[in-house]
Amino acid sequence: MMELGNYCFYIYIKQPKNKQMKRIFLSAFLLVSLSLSAQNIDRKQVVERNNPHLVTMDSLNSLSVGNGGFAMTVDGTGLQSFPKSYSKGIPLGTMSDWGWHSFANPENYKPEESWRYYDYGRGRKEPYATQIKEDKRKKAAGDWYRVNPHRLHLGTLGLSLGSDPKNIQQVNQILDMWDGMIKSSFIYHGRAYQVETTCHPELDMIATHVQSKGSIAFDIRFAYPTGGHCDDACDWNKDHLHSTMLVSQDKNSAVLKRTIDETVYFVMLRWQGTAKLKQKGKNFYQLQSKSADLKLTCEYAEQISSESKTFAEVADAAKVYWNRYWQKGAMVDFGQCKDPRAQEMERRVVLSQ
């Protein structure tokens, strides 16, 4: 498709078979293309007019921030405040490339117990993992290897706003793709909230800035994995099978150690403002503040990290990364096209990147 002024042209090219004619044809086509070239595309304008914009709490409309190796999905509050309400829609996950878990294997199942041998035409029989039903142990082995290892939900970070998302009113949420920031505002029991959420481009770290008329509290919850392939990866009824231990704490930071079977990882919390971390359950902590303005970073890692980033530092790093990202590679601008399908086509092209 080529754009010229207010018109869009779909060009079908049938190349000549003769090589000499091909060269002439290609040269002529390039000259025409250059003569019709428009002004440089305003990439920022194109990206921003296609920013996802939500105005309701909808479990089928969740937004995410991430860096390619780590991501966090949020609800209409800009954080993971209602994970159970979103579990049947687009779940509020927090996952990384390194975050994998396997259930205990007390029966010591071996991979070869789930194998059948087939001839694939290469002169020998080769093993293939299957579900063997006629042998109970082999069936159990196959079932175990079907779900292990599996992706690990690292934890939910949400605002303490009760359990009913219907109490969240006047949602206005935008994913600012140009700067890599989710900007959310809403009303909860008459109180206005403004929330900014972003992700560091190189670290498995979320940063959030919350403003509200009144006190602010963050809920940090952890669930046991399910091993399922089409759920939210959270089993909230097995607290006895995992633990969350407070390793260290000072007035502006805390380190939590997560132990799930043989899987161990750490969660580093750092905040700007007056707040106190309290344990509310075996795998439930709450960061409480009387301040109306609180900034928090939450990093997940296999080892305790010495990185200490403020919200502003994470937001600036994300902005630099995403600004550069959108300024590289190809870009389309259908803003002047009169075809009614152009806007939707542009939206799909931009979001697919």
Regions found by a protein language model. Give the residues of each.
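Methionine residue identity
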Residues: M1-M2
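Intrinsically disordered, low-complexity terminal segments enriched in Ser/Thr
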Residues: I11-I13
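Acidic/polar, glycine-enriched structural segments that form the non-catalytic walls/loops
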Residues: Q39-Q353
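Hydrophobic h-region of N-terminal signal peptides that target proteins for export
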Residues: F29-A38
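Positively charged n-region of N-terminal signal peptides that target proteins for export
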Residues: K17-I24
